[in-house]
Amino acid sequence: MKVTIAQIAKAAGVSPGSVSNALNNRKGTISEQKREHIIRIAEQLGYFKKGKRTGIISLVLYDAGETIVQTDQPFFSALIRGMEEGCHQYDYQLRIRKVRSDDQKAIETLDNISESDGLLVMGTEMHFKDVEKFRHFKIPFVIVDNAYIMENCDFVAINNKDGMYEVTKLLIDKGYTKIGLINSLRMINNFKERKLGFLQALADHDLSFNGDDEIFVEPHIEEGTKDFSRFLHQQKELGILLPEAFVAMNDYIALASLRAMKEEGIPIPVVGFDDIEMARYSEPSLTTVRVNKEDLGKIAVGRLIAKFE
């Protein structure tokens, strides 16, 4: 017997209209908490029949506590926009949910989401051990914005190492020989790959790297500015010369360091990574590695759909 919206509404303790809004993913009509409650009740009642396409893809925001993945930040909003456009092209809806890395039960539940045909996992904060939790999922999935060498997993990510190599080489070609690295206090795999590219570029041009020229800051503009300002004051008090140029792990860090140096009247060039929109309007201007976030999102959707169609 087919489960009705009225039955779901009664079991969930909500109105039929709320059930309809939840099942049709109408944004802004009900809270995310209520939507997830309704979907959970619908699943328990057997509303979603296994073996049939639902026309829905779930985007899983994987939270490992690094505060990197924030959907209101330009990089991730553009990436998600690309996913939404990709889903629209294939006549799918995108539903967003969030899981914490320490919530093993919630992670295991993802493998049995009968409302979704597949998962796009925002893996920016995922470490190797986190990816291991998904390896044997039966539901099709693709991990986005991260990559490891691992069987039974599909990844869609940019080449972080090569991108950082090229932007570092750009500074070297301009004649800079003492180049500092502005790293993140929140370490993720993408940043590790970028550091490898940075070091490789220096090594290929017979340039050494002084560990004292690696600065760690929060990967957000406000906190990063304060961190970099403290570094500048410390170096000044100790009488230590600053590098001739800096490479930053991403544009947020680059913009933070530029702001701090502008306040101190220090005109040292900085290059960034990701090409977020606000970087185009920075003063002084910021050279950065261009990343087509929307295309990355569309490619991820195409890769996922190819796994089950």
Could you describe each region identified by the protein language model?
Residues 1-54:
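N-terminal helix-turn-helix DNA-binding module of bacterial transcription factors
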Residues 20, 53-69, 178-184:
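Short beta-strand segments enriched in small/hydrophobic residues
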Residues 41, 82-86, 133, 193-205, ...:
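Alpha-helical structural signal in soluble globular domains
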Residues 48, 88-93, 140, 177, ...:
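Residue-level detector of anion-binding/catalytic polar loops
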Residues 56-169, 173, 232-241, 245, ...:
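Alpha-helical recognition/docking segments in bacterial nutrient-uptake
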Residues 65-75, 96-104, 156-166, 182-230, ...:
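Hinge/beta->alpha junction and helix N-cap segments in small-molecule ligand-binding domains
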Residues 115-117, 175-178, 210, 242, ...:
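Short loop/turn motifs at secondary-structure junctions
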Residues 229, 233-309:
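Flexible loop/turn connectors
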